[in-house]
Amino acid sequence: MFSNYGTAMGTLFKGILMLAACSGCYLVWWGVAFYPERHVPLWLSGILLVATAACGIMAVNWMAQGIFQAEKVRAGIPVGWILAGGVIGYVVLLVISNIVFHRMVTTELFLIVGWAVLNLIVVDTLYASGLFSDGDSSLFVVLTLIVVVASLYCYMIYYDLEKWKGYIDGFLPLVMVGIAMLAMARVMFLRK
C-alpha cells in the first residue's frame, strides 16, 4: 500500500486503524458495562474489555514498529522530548485534577495523556518521513489538542453528572479519538 515509503508506513497505518478499532471496542464495552439501571453479566463485560485491551496492545505494537522503522527525510521533534512532555503533563494533570479539584484518579487520565503522546509522535513521524506536509502536521497537532482538552473536560465533570449524562459523557472521548484516528488514516491513504 505504501510502497514508496516502505513497510514502516504500512505497519503504522495498520496500527492507526487498529487504534480506531480499539476505540470502537471500548465504546461497546462502555455502552454495555455502564448502561444505567441494567446489570450485565461480568463475563460479558470481561470479554469486551479483553477485546479492547487486545486491540489496544496490537495498535500500540504496530504503531511503535512503524515509528521506529520509518525512514526520516527531514528533522522532526525528538521522541524523547514528546515522551518527557507527556510525563510532565500527566503529573501536572494528576496533581491538578486530584489535589486541586479532588477528582478521583482513574485509568482514563493515563489513557488520555498516553493517546496524546502517541498521536503526537505519530504526527511527528509522518512529518519527518515526508508523508505529511507542514499543514497536515499542524492540522493533526491542533486536532490532537482539541480532542485532549475536550476529553479532559469530560473526565473532570464525569462524577458530577447524573447517571444518563455521565453515561453519554463517557462515550464522547472515545468517539473523538476514533474519528481522529480514522481522519489520520484517511490523510495517510490519500498522501501515499
Label the model's feature ranges.
Residues L17-L27, T52-I57, L83-L94, T144-Y155:
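Hydrophobic cores of alpha-helical transmembrane segments in multi-pass inner/ER membrane proteins
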Residues T7-G10, I121-I157:
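Short alpha-helical packing/oligomerization segments
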Residues L42-L48, F68-G85, V105-V113, D136-V141:
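Transmembrane alpha-helix entry/boundary detector in multi-pass membrane proteins
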Residues L49-T52, L111-V123, F171-A183:
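Small-residue-rich segments of transmembrane alpha-helices in multi-pass membrane proteins
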Residues M181-K192:
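Juxtamembrane boundary at the C-terminal end of a transmembrane helix
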Residues M1-P78:
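N-terminal topogenic module of multi-pass integral membrane proteins
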Residues V28-R38, V92-R103, C154-E162:
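C-terminal ends of transmembrane helices
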